[in-house]
């Protein structure tokens, strides 16, 4: 049952990230012909954790399918909110078309994500979200139903 749920989550993530990439792609394509630039900031990159590995692979597959560039940056520890915020700041400086993020904190990243949005960067929440609704898209399971 758990494996089935992981595969289902993986499939849903791929589809939704692909939809986000496609939507941004077609919007930006009208402006000019170029590859989209995406930065995905998960809570952690851990090769022993199937969940995070699946999410990252799904995002990379969707980016490849839609001819987008994706970079994955993550803090060393899953609960390293400060490290994740530094990566958000770095991403804002890079000015990608979108930041895909699995926020480690419900409140601690709000101001930075608002700043990114004000800079014209699209925001997609993957697996978790923040108190402020700054996102263009949220991809998550209902943990109470699951």
Tell me the role of every PLM-derived stretch.
Residues 49-60, 81, 85, 144:
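Short, surface-exposed alpha-helical segments at coil->helix boundaries
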Residues 9-23:
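Hydrophobic membrane-insertion alpha-helices, especially the h-region
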Residues 1-5:
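Short, Lys/Arg-rich N-terminal segment immediately upstream of the first membrane anchor
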Residues 106-145:
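Flexible loop/hinge segments that line or gate small-molecule binding clefts
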